[in-house]
C-alpha cells in the first residue's frame, strides 16, 4: 500500500518536484503550493494571488532553496524558506502555462502554454530570448536535453513532437504521432484510434540526452533517439488502456515510469530495446541488471515480469501498480536513501510507493 502525505492541499494536486536535498514541492488547483520534508511533514504553504492553478513546480539544482512555479500565465521564483512573497515574477506567456523546463546550465527556462507557444526566458538578463511557435494546439510538455543546454523537445495536443535548437526559431524535426504510425507498433491502426487520437501529453529525456519518451492519449508509449538534427522512433508499445498522462525516465538509466488515465503506474526497462539497435552503451547510463520479480497486490500492489519481454517479444512492465486514480504527475526520488515513486492524482494527497528493487 502507498503511504499518503495529507494535510497540505484541499484540491487536486497537479504537479510535483523534488530537490537534491530531499525537499518535495507540490502545486494544486486554486493557486496552492506546498513544500514538504522527505518524511511528508509540511514545511511551508502559500496561495498565489488570483488563485490560478499551479501547473508546474521546479527546484533549482544549483540552489536547492530556489523554486520555480507556474500559475496561470505567470512564472514565480520563490525561496522555500519564506514562501510568502515571490523573489521574482515573470509575465511572459499569453495563455496558461502547462510545463516548465530548466536547462542544465540553469540560464534558460522554457515555458510551454495553451497557445502552443514555448517562451525561453533568459534568467540572467530577465528577458525573453526566444519565442518558439510551431505547435498548432496546446503545448503540453517541454524538456531541455541533459548535456545540451541549447536543445529541447516538446509535444502537444496537435499530436506533434518536435526537436528544437535555440539557435534557430523553427524546429529541426517534427513528427505527427497519428500519421507516423510505423510497423514497429505492436498492432495495426484500429478504429479505436479515432476515438483515442495520439494527443501528446508528456515528454521525458533520459540522462544521456539522446533518448526521450513521449506519452499520448492513444495509450501508447513511444521512445525516440536523437540522431543529429532529426529523431528516429526506437520503440512504440501500448502501455496503458487509456491515455498516458505522464512519462518519466529515472536518473542515469533507461528505466521509464509511466502513469495513465487508467489509474495504473508502470515501470519499463527499455534499455535492451535501445541497445539492440545501438550496440555501444550510451554515455552516462548505469543500469542494474535485476532478475528479481516484483510483487503483486491490489490497491498499491504490483505485477511484474522477471524478464522484460514475453514469448512473443512484446515488452512487459517490470512493475505495475494499481493506483486506482487518474495520474496527474509522477516523480521518482530518493527518500532516506531509498528510491520512491511519488504520485499526484485527482485527490488532495500525495501517494508514495517504495521502489527498492530498482
UniProtKB/Swiss-Prot annotation:
Biased composition (Basic residues): 278-294
WD repeats: 8-46, 92-131, 134-174, 195-234, 239-278
Keywords (A to Z) from UniProt: Repeat, WD repeat
Domain of life: Eukaryota
Span list, region Disordered: 278-309
Annotated Pfam families: ANAPC4_WD40 (PF12894), WD40 (PF00400)
Gene3D superfamilies referenced in this protein's UniProt entry, alphabetically: YVTN repeat-like/Quinoprotein amine dehydrogenase
Intrachain S-S bonds: none
Similarity section: Belongs to the WD repeat WDR53 family.
Name of the featured protein: WD repeat-containing protein 53
Species the sequence originates in: Bos taurus
